[in-house]
């Protein structure tokens, strides 16, 4: 766990550092979060860590249990299912708008570049890099859609999508990036309705994979 770099508001940097560790699952769901240990790892005092944990609790990332302390939130199947369903709606609309955009040119090149990067990460079994490339890929399509309200809504759920995607990234692997390449072709052709259909199927695959993995772990 790297120590924080200066400058910037300390409480904000501690919050972001802990949130990134949770999102990438460096801190696992259900893991006990000890203030003194986190403070030592980040090279700060316990006060900003305590404030960050309280904020993370408010935002639903951390559970504060009386007489026990702080724990990384363990998402229920229903929570994950609901959020990933909303993600499907947002991303399908974004894919449609991106395909209907007047000149997707530069965006298509960027999407292809991200596909190359994601496929290389899969070959290298670099899960964190694959997850990051996946997030950038979907964010780029959202940007190409050109709808600020849609982008704002997607940003609100984006970090949790990464949280849920990380444990299935290796399993989705090559298939996910193959679906990305098919989607790029349809967007480049300007077929918005087919792009929406393909994105809907793509995100549903991820949702089902996550649900199946959770159920297998609970069995």
What function would you assign to each model-found segment?
Residues 57-63, 156-159, 173-174:
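Mobile beta-alpha loop/short-helix "lid" or hinge segments that flank ligand
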Residues 22, 98, 102, 122, ...:
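Hydrophobic residues in alpha-helical segments
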Residues 83, 105-166, 177-185, 194-204:
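Conserved amphipathic alpha-helical segments that form helical-bundle/coiled-coil interaction surfaces
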Residues 1-100, 207, 211-219:
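Short linear motifs at protein or domain termini
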């Amino acid at each position: 766990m790297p120590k924080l770099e200066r400058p910037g508001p300390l409480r904000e940097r501690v919050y972001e550092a802990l949130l990134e560790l949770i999102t990438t699952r460096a801190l696992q769901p259900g893991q006990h979060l000890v203030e003194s240990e986190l403070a030592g790892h980040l090279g700060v005092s316990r006060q900003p860590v305590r404030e960050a944990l309280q904020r993370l609790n408010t935002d639903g990332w951390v559970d504060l249990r009386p007489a026990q302390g702080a724990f990384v939130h363990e998402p229920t199947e229903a929570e994950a299912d609901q959020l990933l369903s909303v993600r499907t709606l947002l991303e399908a609309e974004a894919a449609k708008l991106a395909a209907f955009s007047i000149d997707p040119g530069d965006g298509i090149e960027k999407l292809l570049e991200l596909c190359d990067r994601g496929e290389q990460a899969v070959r290298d079994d670099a899960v964190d890099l694959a997850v990051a490339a996946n997030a950038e890929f979907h964010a780029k399509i959202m940007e190409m859609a050109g709808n600020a309200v849609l982008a704002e809504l997607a940003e609100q759920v984006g970090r949790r999508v990464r949280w849920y995607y990380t444990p299935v990234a290796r399993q989705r692997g090559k298939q996910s990036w193959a679906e990305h390449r098919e989607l790029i072709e349809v967007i480049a052709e300007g077929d918005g309705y087919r792009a929406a259909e393909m994105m809907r199927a793509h995100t549903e695959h991820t949702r089902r994979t996550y649900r199946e993995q959770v159920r297998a772990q609970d069995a």
